[in-house]
């Protein structure tokens, strides 16, 4: 009788926990940021700074900087990538921002996200650029930081053959 009661309590606890987790951990869907796609910042001597990060922090560098490969949480069979890149301090790529950095956010539903932002009075800095490994557009946040939004195509990005940090 004690074993039967214990088994019943364990089953009840399992199903209550499972049911609660299903009700409370719904995946976030819709147009949104899903993660960090890249961290970009200016440097006086990008080549020397890349060499320093490689030598002392063990970061493998490619043409644009370091790529970090990871597996996506909702489907661990899918790869994702985050880029760490240096730009010359004279770059115009971060304009109209005057900041020394720019963050690239990975997004889902870029077109709808842009429509939602436009409805809120937020206009993109440029038009959507589509390339094989995704779509990009830039916006400004209220404090003058330029933000890059990237709807990635990670399958195509992986084919670019970068020496990824894993």
Predicted regions and their residues:
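Vicinal oxygen chelate
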Residues: 2-3, 15-44, 63-64, 91-166
């Amino acid at each position: 009788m004690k074993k039967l009661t214990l088994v019943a309590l364990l089953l009840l606890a399992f199903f209550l926990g499972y049911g609660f987790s299903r009700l409370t951990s719904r995946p976030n869907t819709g147009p949104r940021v899903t993660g960090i796609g890249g961290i970009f910042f200016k440097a006086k001597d990008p080549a020397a700074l890349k060499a320093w990060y490689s030598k002392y922090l063990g970061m493998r560098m490619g043409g644009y900087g370091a790529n970090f490969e990871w597996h996506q949480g909702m489907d661990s069979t899918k790869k994702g990538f985050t880029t760490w890149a240096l730009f010359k301090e004279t770059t115009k790529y971060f304009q109209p921002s005057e900041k020394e950095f720019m963050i690239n956010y990975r997004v889902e539903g870029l077109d709808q996200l842009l429509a939602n932002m436009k409805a809120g009075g937020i206009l993109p800095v440029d038009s959507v650029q589509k390339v094989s490994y995704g779509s990009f557009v830039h916006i400004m946040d209220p404090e003058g930081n330029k933000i890059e939004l990237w709807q990635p195509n990670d399958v195509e990005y992986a084919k670019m053959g970068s020496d990824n940090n894993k």
